[in-house]
UniProtKB/Swiss-Prot annotation:
It comes from Vaccinia virus (strain Copenhagen). The keyword DNA-binding applies. Transmembrane segments: none annotated. Belongs to the orthopoxvirus OPG062 family. This is Phosphoprotein OPG062. The gene is OPG062. The modification Phosphoserine is found at S53, S62. Phosphorylated on two serines. While these phosphorylations do not play a role in virion assembly; they are essential for the interaction with host RICTOR and RPTOR. One of its GO terms (biological process) is viral protein processing.
């Protein structure tokens, strides 16, 4: 890794006029010139693309327990296990016959 770059402690939040941003990955850059600018001059202002989704909305809290629908006539289909049992038995027999020959 270049000596001029170092990983910053992440994740962290940045508070701006537009809202709060979560930074998941950041790179600390050393020995780089800082350009001072004013907000009225748009040539050096950070551009932030507005998200297409609505502003941060709180999702409704998830249920505290799993609710199961009890339908006595409806059963969950299961895979036939004898198919796997037959496959393993055939494999075992093949290995045994190779060892004996």
């Amino acid at each position: 890794m270049n000596s001029h770059f170092a990983s910053a402690h992440t994740p962290f939040y940045i508070n701006t006029k537009e809202g709060r941003y979560l930074v998941l990955k950041a790179v600390k850059v050393c020995d780089v010139r800082t350009v001072e600018c004013e907000g009225s001059k748009a040539s050096c202002v950070l551009k932030v693309d507005k998200p297409s989704s609505p502003a941060c909305e709180r999702r409704p809290s998830s249920p505290s327990r799993c609710e199961r629908m009890n339908n006595p006539g409806k059963q969950v289909p299961f895979m036939r296990t004898d198919m796997l049992q037959n496959m393993f038995a055939a494999n075992r027999d093949n290995v045994a016959s190779r060892l004996l020959n």
